[in-house]
Regions:
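C-terminal helical subdomain
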Residues: 183, 198-235
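The beta1-alpha1 cofactor-binding region of Rossmann-like NAD(H)/NADP(H)-dependent oxidoreductases
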Residues: 40-41, 60-71, 103
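Active-site helix of classical SDR
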Residues: 121, 157
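Substrate-binding pocket helix/loop in short-chain dehydrogenase/reductase
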Residues: 97-98, 102-107
Length: 264
């Protein structure tokens, strides 16, 4: 979506991390911003921080709760307007071996990371189809490209996002609809979500990640990997290397399989 001025933008997980930064960047582009977050204190703080920057609204929403998604979507349509840009950003991680996950850990991770983007999109996609206009940006992860110990359920949830998001893009293309989909796959970001992670590849700066995402939306990019070589390197390696060689390269040379050993 090349022109964001006066567009209505909904950002889930918008009261902290890259979600909050993206909200600020959207306001700086004269967009109107709606924040969904589970933390009311952070919502209030964000609204206070941004009140002089433009039209910004905040709603406390647990995106793992379908009723809350549906009720708050209705409030937006009734009281504010039709969403032009949806950024599915909310996410959680449980950094444990799979056998250490509780059932709640598994269910909650999949509900928030995988199910919520689809269910939230369902609430707003019909309006976009009716207007033949809109942009949906789904924040996945480079973890959705590669297997990794101590984040198996998180990885599964992000694989889901990538597969669904890009399939939706192709569906909309087949329907000749002017609705753009951007799938984002960043490496670890220094927002506090991945405290304790140790990596040979530099941890990403959240300000730079958020800016790259907004620019990708403005340019209608179909996919964004940060850093850019991650996607090409991963897919190329998976295509040409036997599994044991790929494991050696990824685990020992790149150190990826050990990044979560000190996760807190």
């Amino acid at each position: 979506m090349k022109h964001l001025e006066q567009k209505l933008v909904l950002i889930t997980g918008g009261a902290s991390g890259i979600g909050k930064i993206m909200a600020r960047l959207m306001l700086e582009r004269n967009a109107k911003v709606i924040i969904w977050d589970i933390d009311q204190l952070k919502i209030d703080e964000t609204l206070s921080d941004f009140k002089s920057k433009g039209a910004v609204f905040g709603f406390k929403v647990d995106v793992s709760n379908l009723n809350q998604i549906q009720e708050n979507a209705k409030k937006i349509k009734r009281d504010i307007g039709v969403v032009d840009v949806l950024i599915n950003n909310a996410g959680i991680i449980v950094g444990k071996y799979f056998h250490e996950h509780t059932t709640t850990d598994v269910v909650k991770t999949m509900e928030i990371n995988a199910n919520a983007p689809m269910l939230i999109t369902k609430e707003f996609l019909d309006d976009m189809l009716d207007r033949n206009s809109g942009h949906i940006c789904n924040i996945a992860s480079s973890g959705g490209l590669i297997s990794n110990p101590k984040m198996s359920v998180y990885v599964a949830s992000k694989w889901s996002v990538i597969g669904w998001s890009d399939s939706l893009r192709i569906e909309l293309k087949q329907m000749n609809k002017n609705i753009d989909i951007t799938t984002v796959m960043p490496y670890y970001i220094n927002t506090g979500m991945f405290d304790g992670v140790r990596s040979k590849i530099p941890i990403l700066n959240p300000e730079e990640v958020a800016l790259n995402i907004i620019k990708a939306i403005e340019k209608n990019k179909k996919m964004l990997t940060i850093p850019g070589y991650i996607y090409r390197l991963t897919r190329f390696g998976q295509a040409i290397m036997p599994i044991n060689i790929f494991d050696w390269f990824t685990g020992s040379v790149m150190g990826i399989y050990k990044t979560m050993e000190h996760f807190t």
